[in-house]
């Protein structure tokens, strides 16, 4: 594709050099550039892409998109833009033939519930006869093709290439988790969304966004900017959780019609006659399209919110209510979301991705509602991430568990002991017993907590001290099959470790 054609997707401030040249590929990493490539000089947190323009040119780049002016060799075209990330997103979409322009695309954003809602909506769309691709935290997938997910939402060039591949493979709809980082960094600016879904907003990622206001503002971009109707997609819709305290702000900012969901008064998509049990959720959908009974094997009030989000998104896509019901009833399990791990000790072993205070509270509240005996929670907090949530998670785990085992998560470049101490700071004011590891299980007679740095040892301790009827929750890593120590990923899967811990007991 010629550079001149790509430039029609943006409004450059200045173009120095010829634009009638063929572009062989788009690159934001100078190490990946091939001859004939177009290089985007992105300003990042750790490095400034302008420093690598020379390397890109040496590798054969014939044009550069940048925010700062600077000398370039003769024969190289320089395109100056106000925002290189936005330009890259729009030009990437053009380069790959705007794959979502004529393909239903749903973007789901929020602190918690994104992954579960994508799985549910995928099931609904499949029931409606639309082969559906999903891009999210767990993986990127379509039918039998499954790819690892390096990011919840890929960088725009990678995203548009993936979307083109999915469209060419036969996908008739795409459901995508949209992270706050992706919205802030303009990765999805080249996407043509049909529906945007807001699940909720609670404290997370403040290591990046710094304030909750900034975190909310990143989420609102989807609804305030990227859902504006156009001739290609004139019937865009926003789906918003009206139960969430931030819902009104999202509704007010939305530039398209809004469908609300929730259990509170005024929600357009809601549920009545709801019952929660160890076997799942039953109730009656109440929607603008009518009423319909439903049942789901999923557990807990927070999953009812995810079910309503998926149902509302289905209605926004004008899918039949019966297809929505069938999709929800047929969906069984999201990897690493209250996932049951079998054992022969009569213990309920659950693995969940809950890694924020709110998510952990939701999961433990659900478990408490179905528990007949003690709850033991094994959890930690990620390193090089928002430290402010650590004492919050400590307090939540200790309050809602009978025993909280504080351990390591993905410490990254932080000292695990320091992270655990910050978690402990949220527990100590509760006045609970602090056990020493060597005291357990003999001294385990009442609510308390214990610190065990090794996650593997912490899981094995939990397996040793529980009895039939107890529930063990391994929280924080969910579907992840790795642990990041320093800058290295080591294989570690809570599901595997939990199963092994119980097997070793004989």
Give the location of each predicted region.
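ATP-dependent carboxylate-amine ligase
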Residues: 1-12, 35-38, 289, 299, ...
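N-terminal leader/targeting and accessory segments in enzymes
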Residues: 1-90, 94, 245, 267, ...
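Acidic, Mg2+-coordinating active-site environments of NTP-dependent enzymes
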Residues: 7, 71-75, 184, 195-349, ...
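Glycine/threonine-rich flexible loop motifs
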Residues: 46-52, 185-186, 207-214, 386-389, ...
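A short, gly/pro- and small-residue-rich
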Residues: 49-62, 78-87, 194-199, 215-220, ...
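Short internal beta-strands
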Residues: 62-68, 237-242, 378-379, 402-410
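Short secondary-structure boundary segments
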Residues: 66-69, 178, 200, 408, ...
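Phosphate-binding loop of NTP-binding sites
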Residues: 88-242, 248-254, 308, 370-371
